[in-house]
Amino acid sequence: MSRTARVERVTKETKVLVEIDLDGSGKADIETGVGFYDHMLHQIARHGGFDLTVHTVGDLHIDAHHTMEDTALALGSAVDRALGDRAGIRRYGSATVPMDEVLVRAAVDISGRPYVVHDEPPLAPYIGPVYPTSMTRHVWESFGQSARVTLHVDVLRAARPGGHPDAHHVVEAQFKAVSRALREATAVDPRFTGVVPSTKGTL
């Protein structure tokens, strides 16, 4: 059974196309106009093992907010649709990812109940010219809402001796950890083929 989805989201602020194959090999075709965000979405494809296409045209003449938010909403919707009735999946996934001095833990429950907890230290306001670090939390919140998942992302360690956290490392480790957790949670459990992983019988 194919676990793929295509989502188009069009507003007066953005036009977003997302295609995903949960059982892919990490292929990615990403273009949002926000270079560092593109780099992060490539992490989702590579470390999640998903084939992922994301094409976004947004009102970047204003700022990156709408572009990043609507892309995350469309990505979450694509994951939700690709999962179908969620039968046979592992449901839970977690990963702890180091990136030099940074250590991040992510945990996912494909629960049908959107809830996001995000904890990171204060960071420099921008990575590159247009990626506002304040948007990382909002990306996870938007993704969690539309994917209908519970998501915890905790930066466990970030400080460099005698210096401020490296924002690039802190954010990239988050995307890698979430990707690895999603890979585990969306994986098919061969012991429970066709069985929804809930005593309620639905997610």
From Swiss-Prot:
Major localization class: cytoplasm
Protein name: Imidazoleglycerol-phosphate dehydratase
A Pfam family hit: IGPD
GO BP, one annotated term: L-histidine biosynthetic process
Domain of life: Bacteria
Organism of this sequence: Salinispora tropica (strain ATCC BAA-916 / DSM 44818 / JCM 13857 / NBRC 105044 / CNB-440)
Pathway: Amino-acid biosynthesis; L-histidine biosynthesis; L-histidine from 5-phospho-alpha-D-ribose 1-diphosphate: step 6/9
Entry annotated with the keyword Amino-acid biosynthesis: yes
Keyword annotations: Amino-acid biosynthesis, Cytoplasm, Histidine biosynthesis, Lyase
The protein's Enzyme Commission number: 4.2.1.19
Upper lineage: Bacteria, Bacillati, Actinomycetota, Actinomycetes, Micromonosporales
Molecular-function annotations in GO: imidazoleglycerol-phosphate dehydratase activity
Catalytic reaction list: D-erythro-1-(imidazol-4-yl)glycerol 3-phosphate = 3-(imidazol-4-yl)-2-oxopropyl phosphate + H2O
GO cellular component: cytoplasm
Family: Belongs to the imidazoleglycerol-phosphate dehydratase family.
InterPro entries assigned: IGPD_sf, ImidazoleglycerolP_deHydtase, ImidazoleglycerP_deHydtase_CS, Ribosomal_Su5_D2-typ_SF
Keyword set includes tRNA processing: no
Compartment(s): Cytoplasm
